[in-house]
Design a protein with these regions (language model features):
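Short Lys/Arg-enriched helix C-cap and helix-to-coil transition segments
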Residues: 44-66
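Conserved beta-sheet core of the metallophosphoesterase superfamily
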Residues: 209-302, 307-308
Length: 319
């Protein structure tokens, strides 16, 4: 059979429709091996990624190009970065209440929630633990809107509101896109539709020197590996560890930052830890830029959840 000729643009369109080297090969008249070679060539030429379906039929994560990375320039000002809120309808945490107060007090230029604002345990691939009560998707969405509303009400004029996409957040549209793909594009089927005042991104680069995204490396040395391997300051959530690791070399000093969690580490959604000790801390990070340069980052840490106490700059603050 003679090979069908198609342009790069046609190949990209066909690939995104089928997401399978076998199916694409049949459509354009190439062997699977040659189809994969053509795919790699096009990815290199156009600087794109052509994802394939996983063997179990679940598609890999696809984020539209315009959401992949936000590039921000800030000369002088503060960015507040909280993460891993896992907002629970049963309880408003000390970290969240404190974060809202800091938005009022510090008047940041940008507020970033660094992934996992939702928990979505009820649509997780992990089994329910015993008869554990889990909030419904609607209850979680209502809680998210209310808590984000707390921040929206106190933000200073011109303050940008941004969210990086976390693995828990992806559960929402991930389930819908696989069960009801025919509803793609309908308002409400993406979690971002429920947070209209916030812009969602995969990552946020500040001044080309500070990357903010939900996760990269794992383990106890995650933030060290993030900053040393990226060559830039790197701010992540996901691990709930709330810490800073500086790294200095010939290029100067940069920082690996873990933004901890804005949840209460004793909350019911973390019962999967089986009451084992976890190296988690509740709080958030404060990034200050002067003349475009990131100053040593700061942390605000919850030191007593029950009493609503937060430690920051040598003081105990009650919220």
């Amino acid at each position: 059979m003679a090979k069908k000729v198609c342009t790069d643009e046609e190949f990209i369109t066909i690939w995104r429709e089928h997401q399978s080297p076998d199916k694409v090969g049949k459509a354009i008249g190439l062997s699977t091996r040659n189809t994969l070679k053509r795919r790699r060539t096009i990815e290199d030429t156009h600087g794109i990624v052509l994802d394939a379906l996983k063997p179990n039929g679940m598609p890999k994560i696809y984020i539209p190009d315009e959401q992949m990375q936000a590039n921000i320039t800030i000369d002088n000002g503060t960015i507040l970065v909280g993460s891993d809120c896992h907002y629970n309808p049963e309880y408003v945490t000390t970290a969240h209440r404190g974060f809202v107060e800091f938005v009022k007090y510090l008047k940041p230029k940008i507020v970033i929630l660094n992934g996992d604002i939702a928990d979505f345990a009820s649509i997780s691939k992990h089994h329910r633990i015993g008869w554990q009560k889990r909030p419904t998707v609607k209850e979680e969405l209502d809680e998210i809107q209310e808590r984000l509303g707390d921040i929206e009400k106190v933000r200073p004029a011109g303050c940008k509101l941004m969210i990086t996409i976390g693995n828990h957040d992806l559960r929402y549209s991930g389930l819908l896109s696989n069960l009801t793909p025919q509803y793609e594009g309908i308002k409400g089927f993406d979690i971002a539709d429920h947070t209209p005042h916030w812009k969602w991104y995969w990552s946020i680069m500040v001044n080309q020197t500070c990357m903010i995204k939900h996760r990269w490396h794992n383990g106890i040395h995650a933030v060290y590996n993030n900053t040393i391997k990226s060559g830039t300051s790197f701010v992540t959530g996901h691990l709930h560890s709330l810490k800073i690791t500086p790294w200095t070399d010939y290029t100067g000093t940069r920082y690996g930052v873990d933004t901890g969690t804005m949840a209460c580490i004793k909350d019911s959604q973390f019962s999967y830890t089986e009451n084992n000790p976890v190296n988690w801390r509740a709080g958030w990070a404060i990034l200050t830029f002067i003349n475009g340069k990131l100053m040593p980052p700061e942390l605000a840490e919850v030191v007593n959840e029950d009493e609503g106490l937060i430690y920051f700059r040598g003081q105990l603050l009650k919220v």
